[in-house]
Amino acid sequence: MHDHSLHSGHDHGLGPGSFHDRGAPHARGDLRRRAFTVGVGGPVGSGKTALVLALCRALRDSRSLGVVTNDIFTREDAEFLVRNDALPAERIRAVETGGCPHAAIREDVTANLLALEELTEAHRPEILFCESGGDNLAAHFSRELADYTIYVIDVAGGDKVPRKGGPGITQADLLVVNKTDLATAVGADLDVMARDAARMRGDGPVVFAQVTRGVGVPEIAGHVLHAYRHAVGAPH
């Protein structure tokens, strides 16, 4: 019986963190219980749900997929994905986290684990996406929940966001800087963002994207597939 009471504490919630201290992905022997899981996190409005939709569209013809979304008090993100035909409705589940969305992906992952395991049992997906509720830069997925993590920030917050650090920015397996088309409008310098992201993440990968326009999506999907193949021991 899997212990759903696993808690990861706040060990990575203090300080900016670093990419090489992130708790690297590890081979997990129970992929039949819970399929390879990609955690998608980031602040409110950064484009997490749009990215999940884009990745479903990019991968659904070649891979069996499922999605679990997290919202504080609604099922809005799951309903958006169903409405936009990301996947058949039965492959999309919603978890209502209450007022503390980061706890559901880090301190007490019980509800998300159950939803992911139920999807795995019902549909035998190869890849699951777990989208967190919108939260701050300190929120980051527990490795008990996500085998691979993507953190989404957007240019609308200004070019200062990457250098603020926080575990999401420094320790996600992939950082996505979304909405690059807004840079001029908000006075953000993409070169500054690229430099600061590299400084905060070392050699951790960063993709600059316009998710709703498809820009950067193939590259992001490529990172996901590479991690999946590595996890299942398939040739890259």
Swiss-Prot record:
It is found in: Cytoplasm. Residues 1-26 are annotated as: Disordered. InterPro entries: CobW/HypB/UreG_nucleotide-bd (IPR003495), P-loop_NTPase (IPR027417), UreG (IPR004400). Belongs to the SIMIBI class G3E GTPase family. UreG subfamily. One of its GO terms (cellular component) is cytoplasm. Homodimer. UreD, UreF and UreG form a complex that acts as a GTP-hydrolysis-dependent molecular chaperone, activating the urease apoprotein by helping to assemble the nickel containing metallocenter of UreC. The UreE protein probably delivers the nickel. The keyword RNA-binding does not apply. Gene3D superfamilies: P-loop containing nucleotide triphosphate hydrolases. This is Urease accessory protein UreG. It comes from Anaeromyxobacter sp. (strain Fw109-5). It comes from the Bacteria. The gene is ureG. GTP binds at G42, P43, V44, G45, S46, G47, K48, T49. GO terms for molecular function: GTP binding; GTPase activity; nickel cation binding. GO terms for biological process: urea catabolic process. SUPFAM superfamilies: P-loop containing nucleoside triphosphate hydrolases. Facilitates the functional incorporation of the urease nickel metallocenter. This process requires GTP hydrolysis, probably effectuated by UreG. Pfam families: cobW. CDD domains: UreG.
